[in-house]
Amino acid sequence: MEGDCLSCMKYLMFVFNFFVFLGGACLLGVGIWVLVDPTGFREIVATNPLLTTGAYIVLAMGGLLFLLGFLGCCGAVRENRCLLLFFFLFILIIFLVELSAAILAFIFREHLTREFFTKELTKHYQGDNDTDVFSATWNSVMITFGCCGVNGPEDFKLASVFRLLTLDTEEVPKACCRREPQTRDGVVLSREECQLGRNPFINKQGCYTVILNTFETYVYLAGAFAIGVLAIELFLMVFAMCLFRGIQ
């Protein structure tokens, strides 16, 4: 009976880790393609620090999942105690890091207020400077969601660095102007009319409200997904340790 249980856990662990292995391989493939694609996508990514960072994050996640799945599959099939122990420790480290991140996110959630983002924007935003990660991120957000500032265009009246760099010649950055279509490379309808704050040439809604409304549902889904991932990792650690102890 004990042998049947161990055999069942062994195959369950192999199947699950095989899918983890495939997922990691897919992420690795996507990350490598984005960074080395010869058709021009590489140049687009290279001009945006945010996209470049995202591509490296995808690569890192893919590599981590690839290695994790490989260790789990080999440890289960070969019944290798050393691989199973390494797999257990690997999962344990990831579990503790994710748990710590979740606890920190819960503790500091109250700091991510409208006032906090407004203060950061007015203090650090540099306009169309894509070499500054903070400004490039804000520009991407404003263009993607069709919004302007945290609360609206009036935020940029207090943006000291932005006003200094533009010599007070611009009321709002180019990212606040409406485009057709709404993409980074889309044509601005009218930069002059946008600077005068006239509809329909400027996005007047603040990004805080737009993003909050957009992601309100997804926050709960992300929380449920995170709990599910932690539970799966916990079961994998139990399976790995049971196999480790059962293998003679």
UniProtKB/Swiss-Prot annotation:
GO terms for molecular function: transmembrane transporter binding. Highly expressed in lung. Expressed in adult heart, artery and vein. Keywords: Glycoprotein, Membrane, Transmembrane, Transmembrane helix. One of its GO terms (cellular component) is membrane. Residues 35-49, 105-223 are extracellular. Pfam families: Tetraspanin (PF00335). It is found in: Membrane. Disruption phenotype: Homozygote knockout mice lacking Tspan18 are viables. Its main location: membrane. One of its GO terms (biological process) is establishment of localization in cell. Residues 1-13, 71-83, 245-248 are cytoplasmic. The chain crosses the membrane at residues 14-34, 50-70, 84-104, 224-244. Belongs to the tetraspanin (TM4SF) family. This is Tetraspanin-18. It comes from Mus musculus. The lineage of its organism: Eukaryota, Metazoa, Chordata, Craniata, Vertebrata. The gene is Tspan18.
